[in-house]
Amino acid sequence: LYYNSKGSFQDVAEEYAVQDRFENGRGTALSDLLYRGRLDILSSNWNGMHRAYVLDGDKFKDISTSPYNDPTKIRTVISADFDNDGYDEIFMNNIGEPNKLFKVLEGGIFKEIKMENGLETVGLGTGAAVADVDGDGILELLVSHGESGFQPLTLYKADITNFNYLRIKPLNQYGAPARGATVTM
């Protein structure tokens, strides 16, 4: 974790209690895990415990529980609203073992969700990304493969028919995303 002081970065991971010295980090994602309007940190570790850090006062606290924090051969962690219910799910892209999907319930309880698409029980996933590729308001999941040799990209589309969406994209005066903007409807 680095603090940006006018373009000069200072390592503050230890100060904020997110230093994970004994794990082999593979991916990081940001998400509002407790739906408080604050970003929390998801940290994934190769064959080590995965972490879910939430800001508690002036330090972060790991709220991860099993089965979320169980070690896996992880390559990527993504937080996104895959089912269009307004709340993020957490996708873990693993190599040589099934991918996993979690929902964070009230109080920070992690519940594994059965995956219809994207499980890839023996896939050699090396990374993943999420976007609304076809513009229908439902996020697609793109998984890359190829640990050794050629393997294709796989694009997964969720079969969702019972949720609606409204896309609002606040921009600043330069056309960039207006981070921290508040939208009132």
Predicted regions and their residues:
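Blade-edge motifs of beta-propeller repeat domains
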Residues: 2-23, 53-72, 102-123, 160-169, ...
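Structural motif
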Residues: 49-53, 98-100, 149-156
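Gly/Ser/Thr/Pro-enriched helix-cap/hinge segments flanking short amphipathic alpha-helices
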Residues: 109, 114-185
